[in-house]
Amino acid sequence: MVSQVLTVCTANICRSPVAEAVLRAGLPGLTVRSAGLYALVGRGIDPEIAETARAQGIALHDHAARQFDDTIGREADVIIVMETHHRQDIGQRWPQFLGKTFLLGHFDNARQIPDPYKQTAGMQHHSVELIAQCSRTWIHQLEQMTR
C-alpha cells in the first residue's frame, strides 16, 4: 500500500516542489514530500516558478529544499522523478530504490519534464503545466492503488 510519495528533481526549487503541491492537494490521505539530487539545501521555491504555479491555481506551501539521501529514499513508497537522468542517477547511487522510482510522466507516454530554472516565461509556464497534468494522472493512479 502506498502511504508516502516523494517527488525528486535536481535542486528541489522548481519542479519537485510544484509536483509535491499538486499531489498533496489531490491526495490528502498520503504524505507527499520532495527532495533534490543536488539540492540547494534550505532555499525556497524559485520566485518565478512560484508565481507561475500560483497563476495556474497551484497552492504552494512554505518550502525549504532538501537533499535526497538514503533515509528519505527509504521512507518513500513511490519516488517520482522529472527526467530519465534523475531515475538513472538514483539507480546508480541508490540501486535499492530503482524499483520504486518512476517518471512523473510515466503514465503520459514517459514524458520528460524540462527544467524551467532561469528559462523564458513561456518555458516556465509550459513546464508547470506539464507538472500539473502529469501529477493529476498520478493522483488518479495512486487513488486506485490505495483503495
Say what each PLM segment does.
Residues 53, 79-80:
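Hydrophobic packing within well-folded, soluble alpha/beta domains
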Residues 78, 84-147:
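Phosphate-binding/catalytic loops
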Residues 7, 80-81:
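Hydrophobic beta-strand core positions in alpha/beta domains
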Residues 1-74, 140-147:
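Conserved active-site segments centered on acidic
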